[in-house]
């Protein structure tokens, strides 16, 4: 456990950041699941709409460092290919 003032402050900041990141990651996964569900249902319009929502979210998470930029690119590419195939 933190023994001095600065270490205690860093521990508090790290916990706040962890909770914030967990919330953002959960939100990202929720929108990704909505996109996957729309693709699985075969509804091209709903899938396109969900993809339009999830794309900037993935980009934002990559910019903020929650996910790697290649992971965001991979998800966007695969979603686009799956929607195109509908």
Curated annotation (Swiss-Prot):
It comes from Vibrio vulnificus (strain YJ016). Binds directly to 16S ribosomal RNA. It comes from the Bacteria. NCBIfam families: S20. This is Small ribosomal subunit protein bS20. The keyword Hydrolase does not apply. Coiled coil: none annotated. GO terms for cellular component: cytosol; small ribosomal subunit. One of its GO terms (molecular function) is structural constituent of ribosome. One of its GO terms (biological process) is translation. Gene3D superfamilies: Ribosomal protein S20 (1.20.58.110). Residues 1-27 are annotated as: Disordered. Pfam families: Ribosomal_S20p. Belongs to the bacterial ribosomal protein bS20 family. Keywords: Ribonucleoprotein, Ribosomal protein, RNA-binding, rRNA-binding.
């Amino acid at each position: 456990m933190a023994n001095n003032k600065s270490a205690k402050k860093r521990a508090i900041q790290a916990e706040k950041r962890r909770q914030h990141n967990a919330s953002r990651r959960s939100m990202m996964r929720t929108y990704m699941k909505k996109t996957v569900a729309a693709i699985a249902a075969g509804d091209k319009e709903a899938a396109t709409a969900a993809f339009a929502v999830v794309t900037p979210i993935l980009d934002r998470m990559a910019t903020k460092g929650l996910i790697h930029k290649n992971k965001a690119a991979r998800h966007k590419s695969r979603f686009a290919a799956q929607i195109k195939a509908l």
